[in-house]
UniProtKB/Swiss-Prot annotation:
Protein name as it appears in the record: 3-hydroxyacyl-[acyl-carrier-protein] dehydratase FabZ
Keyword Cytoplasm: yes
Biological process, per Gene Ontology: fatty acid biosynthetic process; lipid A biosynthetic process
E.C. designation(s): 4.2.1.59
UniProt function note: Involved in unsaturated fatty acids biosynthesis. Catalyzes the dehydration of short chain beta-hydroxyacyl-ACPs and long chain saturated and unsaturated beta-hydroxyacyl-ACPs.
Keywords assigned by UniProt, alphabetized: Cytoplasm, Lipid A biosynthesis, Lipid biosynthesis, Lipid metabolism, Lyase
Length: 145
């Protein structure tokens, strides 16, 4: 398990763009389970949508990518402070199955499916109460900064 203070050691993101609150399970070189608590206080709800708040799909994908980023960094035994960054370089087959709204706990799952020359590919899912909200294949690149 990792709390937000430890997560911040592995992700360069900060408020309002840190979208992982806790890691509940991590299996190095394999998979991760994390979550994001979605509250009405999220800044994006001011405009998306004022009378019917829904978490933007691109931010659900970003949350999955951040969870995958923690898995990648931990699997490589690296941190951003070591001069490495994990760029989000692509998403394939993204599908949205249900809206994510204030009060939801978004569970984020990522599984490594390939790694070659610093390009990592993950099969990702985001669920709420066991219901699929989003799925995508996400690619990230480990690069020196």
């Amino acid at each position: 398990m990792m709390d937000v203070n430890e997560i911040r050691q592995y992700l360069p993101h900060r408020y309002p763009f840190l979208l992982v609150d806790r890691i509940v399970e991590i299996n190095l070189n394999d998979s991760i389970i994390a979550y994001k608590n979605v509250t009405i206080n999220e800044p994006f709800f001011n405009g998306h949508f004022p009378n019917h708040p829904v978490m933007p799909g691109v931010l659900i994908i970003e949350a999955m990518a951040q969870a995958a980023g923690v898995l990648g960094f931990k699997s490589m035994d690296k941190k951003p402070e070591d001069g490495s960054i994990y760029y989000f370089v692509g998403a394939d087959n993204a599908r949205f199955k249900r809206p994510v709204v204030p009060g939801d706990r978004l569970q984020l799952e990522a599984k490594i499916i390939a790694e070659k020359r610093g390009i990592w590919k993950f099969e990702c899912r985001a669920t709420v109460d066991g219901q699929l909200a989003c799925s995508a294949t996400i690619m990230c690149a480990d690069r020196k900064i």
